[in-house]
């Protein structure tokens, strides 16, 4: 609010290792107050400035399954309601809307699939057997809708065409060996997308829509922007053993 006197910037953070803070490429004063990073003496006026915060965290020790965590040697996020503050210092409130550009780098054999919200802008190989993927979400969103996934996953894919003639890619990612259990989830996703467009005139606003299934997920389903993360019970259905209730549950959640 330009009519309010300048105040300290307080950013939420939990269980983070802070390396450094920079403003417009230079050092700046800060302090830690409980679970907040407090920045003072920021540039005055209404001019924008660049704030860079370098942090690390340990997802392998994150037993809360909130923020960035490891499940079966893969990385997942759960940011609702206040999990993003466990990834980096941020204004972790639902009224703060921002666009995100995310670059993921990892060992290509251990983590061949690198996902985040939005559209895949670029991907490629790096040195020492590593690779990268760069994602950009052009739509502003609260940080609790941020998502990240990295691991050994395979995908069922389906291309669809909206009423405007634009092509979109639908993907359902699962563990290797579970791909044959994803047909109903994909059919449910296609039906959901078609219904949104027919009923409300709302086509997909991204180039792709992704669902990822994991067994260690404490929310059942999390509808992150463009990258939904679901518990496997709401994605996987073996036609030989699943009940009508299982199929109905998948359709209702997807």
Predicted regions and their residues:
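A surface-exposed beta-strand-loop module
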Residues: 6, 13-71, 128
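The feature marks proteins involved in alpha-glucan
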Residues: 70-80
């Amino acid at each position: 609010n330009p009519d309010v006197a300048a105040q300290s910037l307080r950013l939420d953070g939990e269980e983070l290792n802070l390396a450094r803070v920079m403003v417009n490429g230079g050092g700046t004063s800060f302090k830690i107050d409980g679970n907040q990073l407090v920045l003072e003496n920021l540039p005055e006026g209404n001019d924008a400035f660049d704030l860079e915060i370098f942090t690390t965290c340990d997802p392998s020790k994150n037993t809360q399954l909130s923020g960035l965590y490891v499940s079966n040697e893969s990385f997942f996020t759960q940011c609702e309601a206040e999990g993003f503050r466990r990834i980096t210092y941020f204004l972790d409130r639902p009224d703060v809307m921002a666009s995100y550009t995310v670059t993921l780098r990892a060992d290509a054999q251990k983590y061949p699939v690198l996902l985040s919200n939005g559209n895949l802008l670029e991907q490629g190989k790096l040195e020492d057997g590593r690779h990268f993927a760069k994602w950009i979400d052009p739509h502003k969103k609260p940080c609790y809708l941020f998502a990240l996934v990295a691991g050994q996953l395979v995908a069922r894919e389906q291309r669809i065409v909206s009423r405007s003639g634009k092509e979109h890619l639908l993907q359902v990612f699962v563990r290797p060996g579970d791909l044959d259990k994803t047909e109903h989830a994909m059919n449910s996703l296609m039906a959901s997308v078609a219904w949104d467009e027919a009923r409300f005139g709302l086509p997909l606003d991204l180039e792709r829509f992704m669902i990822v299934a994991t067994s260690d997920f404490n929310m059942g389903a999390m509808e992150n922007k463009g990258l939904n993360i679901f518990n496997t019970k709401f994605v996987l259905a073996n036609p030989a053993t699943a009940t009508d209730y299982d199929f109905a549950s998948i359709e209702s959640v997807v």
